[in-house]
């Protein structure tokens, strides 16, 4: 591990109404609470009905769009998406489907990863969405990090958060802000990914 170079954790997300982006920023804050770690916040562009990128190269707001270079350079990954019928949103799936070269080269193998999501309703498919995002990460050979019940907020939350990852219940009007426990759990998830990335780097991968 290079003592002068920070370990970068890629926080990669798709967000339509802004709630998943809010979670991503909290995860990134948790990453940067770990000494020697830095978060790289990136989003994926929307896709058109014909399943191709449907946005200019530079987003109008939010984080820059992700590239394959971001994946190869990261020491850990936190992946976020709103739910779409209990699954990840199409733009994130489209991006992940394009990572065959990284899979073939093992670029992500042996790196820690975590997932986060937001839904409009309490039972709108949070856990199935989190699990759907884990599948490609397992194919990439990543170490999955969740949220254990040693995190006090997981016992207190009446909104988002589960052992599978951080989450947020946005409400049917997409208006509520992240709750206190949701914020706490998102930051805890970022810390856990970053801490494992540091341990793996110190151990030589």
For every predicted segment, state its role:
Residues 109-159:
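Short, glycine-/small-residue-rich phosphate/pyrophosphate-handling segment
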């Amino acid at each position: 591990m290079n003592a002068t170079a920070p370990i970068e954790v890629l926080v990669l997300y798709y967000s339509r109404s802004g709630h998943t982006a809010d979670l991503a920023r909290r995860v990134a804050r948790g990453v940067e609470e770990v000494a020697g770690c830095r978060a790289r916040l990136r989003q994926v562009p929307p896709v058109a009905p014909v399943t191709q990128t449907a946005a200019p190269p530079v987003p109008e707001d939010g984080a820059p769009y992700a590239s394959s270079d971001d994946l190869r350079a990261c020491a850990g990954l936190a992946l976020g998406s709103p739910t779409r019928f209990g699954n990840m949103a199409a733009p994130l799936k489209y991006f992940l489907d394009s990572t065959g070269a990284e899979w073939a080269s093992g670029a992500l193998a042996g790196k820690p990863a975590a997932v986060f999501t937001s839904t409009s309703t309490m039972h709108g498919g949070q856990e199935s969405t989190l699990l759907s995002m884990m599948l490609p990460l397992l194919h990439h050979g990543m170490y999955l990090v969740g949220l254990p019940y040693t995190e006090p907020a997981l016992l207190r939350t009446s909104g988002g958060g589960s052992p599978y990852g951080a989450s947020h219940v946005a409400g049917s009007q997409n208006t509520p802000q992240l709750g206190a426990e949701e914020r706490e759990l998102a930051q805890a998830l970022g810390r856990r990914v970053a801490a494992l990335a540091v341990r793996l780097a110190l151990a030589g991968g």
